[in-house]
UniProtKB/Swiss-Prot annotation:
Role noted for this protein: NDH shuttles electrons from NAD(P)H:plastoquinone, via FMN and iron-sulfur (Fe-S) centers, to quinones in the photosynthetic chain and possibly in a chloroplast respiratory chain. The immediate electron acceptor for the enzyme in this species is believed to be plastoquinone. Couples the redox reaction to proton translocation, and thus conserves the redox energy in a proton gradient.
Top-level enzyme category: translocase
Annotated protein name in UniProt: NAD(P)H-quinone oxidoreductase subunit 4L, chloroplastic
Pfam families: Oxidored_q2
Any GO CC annotation of this UniProt entry: NADH dehydrogenase complex
Enzyme Commission designation: 7.1.1.-
Presence of the UniProt keyword Transport in the record: yes
Organism: Chaetosphaeridium globosum
Gene that this polypeptide is encoded by: ndhE
HAMAP family per record: NDH1_NuoK
Compartment(s) where it occurs, according to its Swiss-Prot or TrEMBL record: Plastid, Chloroplast thylakoid membrane
Reaction(s) catalysed (UniProt annotation): a plastoquinone + NADH + (n+1) H(+)(in) = a plastoquinol + NAD(+) + n H(+)(out); a plastoquinone + NADPH + (n+1) H(+)(in) = a plastoquinol + NADP(+) + n H(+)(out)
Disulfide bond entries: none
Amino acid sequence: MIENILIIGAFLFCIGTYGLITSKNMIKVLMCLELMFNSVNINLVAFSNFFDSESIKGQVFAVFIIAIAAAEAAIGLAIVFALYRNRRSTKVNQFNLLKW
């Protein structure tokens, strides 16, 4: 049973990595990063349940990771919207300069 869950988590992580590498849109990059975080959470909860089914340490840690990922997404989207307001684009290759 754990093998199936780990395969699903690895598959989602690979999809997120592929999207992160090939995407040219900043919002898609953030979505792929969130997909990678969630796939790690799936594997974390699966391993936690497999090794110690009595404890909920893995689930609690996954909730903390979700909270941190939500804060990261909010900050990332705020930065993307601020850059869009100035550059009128969300393409990754246009944000290689730090000056406006």
